[in-house]
Amino acid sequence: MKFDALTEEHLDALKEVSNIGVAHAATALSQLIGKGITLQVPKVHLMKITEVPEAFGGAERIVVGIYLQMLGDARGNILIVLPRESALKLLSRLLPREKSEGSLLTELEISALKEVGNILASAYLNALGALMRKTLIPSVPVLSFDMAGAVIDYVLIELGEVGDLALMVETEFFGEEEKIGGQFFLLPDPESLRIILDAIGVKL
Amino acid sequence: MSRIVSVGISEFKIASAPTILMTYGLGSCVGIALHDPVALTGGLAHTLLPAPVRGMDSMVKSAKFTCWAVDLMVEELIKCGCVAERLVAKLAGGATMFEPQHRTTHSGIGERNVTAAKEALERRGIPLVASDTGDDYGRSLEFNTVTGVITVRALQRPIKRM
C-alpha cells in the first residue's frame, strides 16, 4: 500500500491503535519505575525521508535510541527515543548505584535500557496484536547513544529502498513527577500497513 | 560572514566560496564531498543507501543512492564552472550504529555505502584524498568550500579536520 494513498480516516485509525498500544506500554513503564506516566495524543507523520531528522527534534540532538523490529503477521520498525537526560533519570530509578561520571553508558546501563525497550515494545505489540487478532512480536532490542540523525538513518534504510516517504506514528510520554519522557515511534512497512488497517476493519 | 547551507538525508548541495556546506548526524549514511580547489566550488551529498534494489532502478535519480550521488554532483559542478579533472573527493560516515547481531536485512549498510562511494569515484576518476569512515558513532560535517577542509564532529570525540 502506498503511503500517499492514505486518507484521514486511515490516519485516525492508526492513531487510535497506536494510542492503545502505547497506553499498555506506559502502564508497563509506570510499574517498572513506580511512577505514573502520561501520554500525549499520538501524531501521525507522513513526510519525506529528508525531513525525518527534524521530526525527531533535530539531527544533532543527543539521544538514546532503542530499536526493535516488529515481527510476525505484520512487519515494521519500532524506535524509542529518550533524550539523554531522560535516559539517565530512568537509569537512576532502575539501577541502585549512583551514575558514574562521564556521559558514556556502561554495559549495565545499556542492558537496563534495552530491557526497558523490550518491555515497552512487548506491551505495545501485545495490545496491537490483540486488537488485530494477529501475532506481533518484537525482535531483540539494540541501542545506540548518539546524535538523533545518526540513530535514525538506520530505521530509514528499508523505507528508502521502496520510496521517499516515511510514515511514523509518534506518541510522546512523560513521567508525572520525574523528568522522564520520550517518544515512541512505529514505522510500519508499506505492505504491513494494509495488514494493520485491514485487521482493524478500516476500509481500504 | 560565510553563508551556511545544510544538506539533508538523500540530498546534495553545490556551493561556492565562502559558503560552508553542513550535514548533521551521519550514521550509516555517507557524506561525499567533492571540491574544485581552483573554482573554489564544492558539493556535499548525504546518501542513505548504496544502490537501488532490483526492480526499483527506474526511480528518479537522487542522492539517496550513493551510486548516483557522485554522478549527479559532478554534472552539477561542471555546470557551475568546475573542471572534472581538478575535482578531489573526501568521504565520512558509514558507521555501524547498532550491534552486528541485529543486522539482518541491512547488514553492513555503512560499509556498503562507503564501498559504493569509492566505486562511483573511481568510475569518474576522482581521487579520494581523505576519509573518516566506519566505527560505531555518528558524525556531523562542515565543508569549507574555500579551503576544501572538512571538519568532522562526533559525540565524545575530538574534532577532526581533514
Curated annotation (Swiss-Prot), chain B:
Similarity remark:
Belongs to the CheD family.
Q: What class of enzyme is it?
A: hydrolase
Q: What does this protein do?
A: Probably deamidates glutamine residues to glutamate on methyl-accepting chemotaxis receptors (MCPs), playing an important role in chemotaxis.
Q: Which Pfam families match?
A: CheD
What EC number(s) are associated with this protein in UniProt?
Answer: 3.5.1.44
- Catalyzed reactions: L-glutaminyl-[protein] + H2O = L-glutamyl-[protein] + NH4(+)
* Single GO MF annotation: protein-glutamine glutaminase activity
For this UniProt record, give its keywords in alphabetical order, as a comma-separated list. Chemotaxis, Hydrolase
Q: Which organism is it from?
A: Geobacter sulfurreducens (strain ATCC 51573 / DSM 12127 / PCA)
State whether keyword Hydrolase applies. yes
**Superkingdom:** Bacteria
Protein name, as recorded: Probable chemoreceptor glutamine deamidase CheD 3
> InterPro entries under this entry?
CheD-like_sf (IPR038592), Chemorcpt_Glu_NH3ase_CheD (IPR005659), Cytotoxic_necrot_fac-like_cat (IPR011324)
User: GO annotations under biological process?
Assistant: chemotaxis
Q: Which SUPFAM superfamilies does the record associate with it?
A: CNF1/YfiH-like putative cysteine hydrolases (SSF64438)
